[in-house]
UniProtKB/Swiss-Prot annotation:
One Pfam family recorded for the sequence: FUSC
Transmembrane in keyword set: yes
Single GO biological process annotation from the record: carboxylic acid transport
Name of the protein: p-hydroxybenzoic acid efflux pump subunit AaeB
Location(s) in or outside the cell: Cell inner membrane
TM spans (from-to): 13-33, 38-58, 69-89, 93-113, 121-141, 152-172, 370-390, 407-427, 431-451, 459-479, 482-502
GO CC aspect terms: plasma membrane
Biological source species: Escherichia coli O7:K1 (strain IAI39 / ExPEC)
Length: 655
C-alpha cells in the first residue's frame, strides 16, 4: 500500500470525522458562539483520538466514553481554574505558578489511575491553565469564559457522538465471541505443553502470549460494556471469564513446575490423554467431557490437584462462554459461578514514575511562564497552553518522547496547511456556510485517513490546524496573529520535548523491584486463617502487575518466571488447609507487616534488613507448622516459597 493510498476500511471513519467537524461548525455558528473553533476542535479530538489509538475505526462506545471523560475533565478544570482565580487574582504571577502545579498534580493522578480514565485528569490539568491564561487581560469575565468553554466543548462532544451513531459504528461483540473460542483452544494447548514438560522457552512464550490475550480480552470487555446496556449480562460473564482464564494459566504453569521435582505425579494416563491434538473449541469440548469421565473413574485423590483444578476452571469457562455468545438470561449454575470472591485492588507500583511525570509537567509549564514573561511575546500564552497539553497527555503513555515528537511534526505540518486555509480557502468560503463546511470536511476526511494509519504527526496536525485557522464569530483575518499562534504552538511543543529529554525517567528499575516485592507480599498474605481474607480474589490484580512487568522489561524471562512462581505460590497457599489457632494467626499478621515494610522501604539497607527479617520469620513459621502438625499441602508450598526468596534475595532488595 502506497503512502498516499486510501484503503476501503478507512473511508467510513474518515467520513464520520468529517461529519463530526461539519456538525460542530454548523451548530457553533448557528447558536452564535463566540469561538466555534473550540466546538470543532473538541469534535475532531474526541472522534480522532480513539481511532489513532486503535489504528483504525474505533469500536462502538469508544467515542462516547472519551466524550464523557472530556466533559468530566473540562468541568473539573473549569472549577479548579475559577477557585484559583478567586483566591489569587491579586497576585497574577503566583496564580499562574499555582496553575502550573495544578497541571503537574493532575498528571500525577493520571499516572496512578486506570489508563482509560487518565484522559480526564490530564484534561483537567491544562483546562485550568487555559482559563487562567486566557482571562489575563479581563479577569472579571472568568465565569462567562468558563461557561462558554464548557458549552462549546459539550456541543463538540455531542456532535462527535451523533456522527458516530449516524455511521453505524462496528460492534466488538463478534470479536469477543471469536476470541473466547480461540482462547480456550490456546489454554488447552498450553496445558499440553506443560504436561509434555518440553522446552522451557516455548512454554514461557506460550503462557506470556496467553497473559497478553487475556488482558486484551479484558479490554474488549470494557469496550463491550461501553457499547450498550444490552450487553450487561455478557459483561458479568466476561468479568468471571477473566479470572478463570488466569486460573487456567496458573494451573498449567504449576503443572510444569511440579514436574521439575516430582515428575511421577503426572501419571501416564494423563500424559497419553493430553497427547491428542486439538484445533477447535469443539475439539476441546469433546476432550473435556472425556477428561471429566477419566477423573470420575480414577478418583479425585488419584488426580493431580493442578489438573483437577484446571478441568474445573475450563468447565466453568465453557459454560460462561456459551452464555456470552448467546447473551441469554443468567441461569442458577452461572449465578453461582458469578457470585465469586471479591477482587482486590492493588496499590500502584508506579508512584516514583508518577512523581517524575509531576515534575516534568510542572517544570515545563513554569519554563513556559518564564519564557512568556521574559520575551513578552504575544503568543507566549499559546506556547504555554501547548506545553501543558503535550506534557499532560504524553506522560501517561509508554513513550512520552515519541508523543512529543508527534506533536512537533503535527504543529510543523499545521503551519503550511493552516496558511492555505487562512489565506486562500476560508476568505473565499466564509460568505457561504455550505462552502465553509465542505472545505473543513475535506480537511477532516484526509486527515482522518492518516490518523487511522497512525501516521507520525497526523493527530497533532489535525488539532493544530483547526486551532490556528480563523473559526471565530465574527471572523477576523490578522496575519500577525495567525503567525504568532502557529509559531507559539511549535515553540511550546519544542519546549515540552526539551523538558521531557532533560528530566530523565529512571524509575523503570525501581518499578520492577516494587512489582516483584508486591508479588512476594501477595504470597505471604495468602498465609492466613482469616476466612474473609482467604476468599479475596487477588488473581486479576497479580496478573495485571505481571502484564505491567512484561511491558516494562520485554524479554526479561527470569523476572517473568519469578513473578509467575510467586503467583503460583499465592494460589497454592490460599487453598492450603492451614491449622487454625491464635499462635499462627498472630504470626501471619507479623509476616504481613514485615512484607509491607519491604515494599515501603526507601533505601537498600532498610529493604535488605526487612527482607532478612522476613526470611527469618519464614524459617520460624516452618518450625511452627511442624509443631502444629500441618499437612504437606501447607508445608511444601511454604518451603518452596522460602527457597525462592533465598535464591532471589539480591534481585528483590538491591537497586
Amino acid at each position: 500500500m502506497g503512502i498516499f493510498s486510501i484503503a476501503n476500511q478507512h473511508i467510513r471513519f474518515a467520513v464520520k470525522l468529517a461529519t463530526a467537524i461539519v456538525l460542530a461548525l454548523f451548530v457553533g455558528f448557528h447558536f452564535q458562539l463566540e469561538t466555534p473553533r473550540w466546538a470543532v476542535l473538541t469534535a475532531a479530538i474526541v472522534a480522532a483520538g480513539p481511532a489513532f489509538a486503535a489504528g483504525g475505526e474505533p469500536y462502538s462506545g469508544a467515542i462516547r466514553y472519551r466524550g464523557f471523560l472530556r466533559i468530566i475533565g473540562t468541568f473539573i478544570g473549569c472549577i479548579a481554574g475559577l477557585v484559583i482565580i478567586i483566591a489569587m487574582i491579586r497576585a497574577p504571577l503566583l496564580m499562574i505558578l499555582v496553575c502550573c502545579i495544578w497541571a503537574g498534580f493532575c498528571t500525577w493522578i493520571s499516572s496512578l489511575v486506570r489508563i482509560e480514565n487518565s484522559y480526564a485528569w490530564g484534561l483537567a490539568g491544562y483546562t485550568a491553565l487555559i482559563i487562567v491564561i486566557t482571562i489575563q487581560p479581563e479577569p472579571l469575565l472568568t465565569p462567562q469564559f468558563a461557561v462558554e468553554r464548557c458549552s462549546e466543548i459539550v456541543i463538540g462532544i455531542v456532535c462527535a457522538i451523533m456522527a458516530d451513531l449516524l455511521f453505524s459504528p462496528r460492534s466488538i461483540k463478534q470479536e469477543v465471541d471469536r476470541e473466547l473460542e480461540s482462547l480456550l483452544v490456546a489454554q488447552y494447548q498450553l496445558m499440553q505443553l506443560c504436561i509434555k514438560h518440553g522446552d522451557g522457552e516455548v512454554v514461557d512464550k506460550a503462557w506470556g502470549d496467553l497473559v497478553r490475550r487475556t488482558t486484551a480480552l479484558q479490554g474488549m470487555r470494557s469496550n463491550l460494556n461501553m457499547e450498550s446496556s444490552r450487553w450487561a449480562r455478557a459483561n458479568r460473564r466476561l468479568k468471571a471469564i477473566n479470572t478463570l482464564s488466569l486460573t487456567l494459566i496458573t494451573q498449567s504453569c504449576e503443572t510444569y513446575l511440579i514436574q521439575n521435582t516430582r515428575p511421577e505425579l503426572i501419571t501416564d494416563t494423563f500424559r497419553e490423554f493430553f497427547d491428542t491434538p486439538v484445533e477447535t473449541a469443539q475439539d476441546v469440548h469433546k476432550q473435556l467431557k472425556r477428561l471429566r469421565r477419566v477423573i470420575a473413574w480414577t478418583g479425585e485423590r488419584e488426580t493431580p490437584v493442578t489438573i483437577y483444578s484446571w478441568v474445573a476452571a475450563a468447565t466453568r469457562y465453557q459454560l460462561l462462554k456459551r452464555g456470552v455468545i448467546s447473551n441469554t438470561k443468567i441461569n442458577a449454575t452461572e449465578e453461582e459461578i458469578l457470585q465469586g470472591e471479591p477482587e482486590v485492588k492493588v496499590e500502584s507500583a508506579e508512584r516514583h514514575h508518577a512523581m517524575v511525570n509531576f515534575w516534568r509537567t510542572t517544570l515545563s509549564c513554569i519554563l513556559g511562564t518564564l519564557f512568556w514573561l521574559w520575551t513578552g511575546w504575544t503568543s507566549g500564552s499559546g506556547a504555554m497552553v501547548m506545553i501543558a497539553v503535550v506534557t499532560s497527555l504524553a506522560m501517561r503513555l509508554p513513550n512520552p518522547r515519541m508523543v512529543a515528537i508527534d506533536f512537533i511534526y503535527g504543529t510543523l505540518a499545521a503551519l503550511p496547511l493552516g496558511l492555505l486555509y487562512f489565506l486562500v480557502i476560508i476568505p473565499n468560503t466564509q460568505q457561504s456556510m455550505l462552502l465553509l463546511c465542505i472545505s473543513l470536511a475535506v480537511l477532516g476526511f484526509f486527515l482522518g485517513i492518516e490518523v487511522q494509519k497512525r501516521r507520525l504527526g497526523s493527530m497533532g496536525a489535525l488539532a493544530s490546524t483547526i486551532n490556528i485557522i480563523v473559526l471565530d464569530n465574527p471572523m477576523t483575518f490578522h496575519f500577525n496573529q495567525f503567525l504568532d499562534s502557529a509559531l507559539g504552538q511549535i515553540v511550546g511543543c519544542v519546549l515540552a520535548f526539551t523538558v521531557i529529554l532533560l528530566v530523565r525517567d529512571k524509575s523503570r528499575d525501581r518499578t520492577g523491584r516494587v512489582l516483584l516485592n508486591q508479588f512476594v507480599s501477595a504470597a505471604v498474605s495468602a498465609m492466613t486463617t482469616n476466612v474473609a481474607r482467604r476468599k479475596e480474589n487477588h488473581l486479576p490484580a497479580l496478573y495485571q502487575q505481571l502484564f505491567l512487568l512484561m511491558n516494562k522489561f520485554p524479554g526479561d524471562l527470569p523476572k517473568f518466571r519469578l513473578a509467575l512462581t510467586m503467583i503460583i505460590a499465592h494460589q497454592r497457599l490460599r487453598d492450603a488447609p492451614i491449622p487454625v489457632n491464635e499462635d499462627l494467626s498472630a504470626f501471619h499478621r507479623q509476616m504481613r507487616r514485615t512484607a509491607d515494610h519491604v515494599i515501603s522501604a526507601r533505601s537498600d539497607d532498610k529493604r535488605r534488613r526487612y527482607f532478612g527479617q522476613l526470611l527469618e520469620e519464614l524459617e520460624i513459621y516452618q518450625e511452627k507448622l511442624r509443631i502444629w502438625q500441618a499437612p504437606p499441602q501447607v508445608t511444601e508450598p511454604v518451603h518452596r516459597l522460602t527457597g525462592m526468596l533465598h535464591k532471589y534475595q539480591h534481585a528483590l532488595t538491591d537497586s
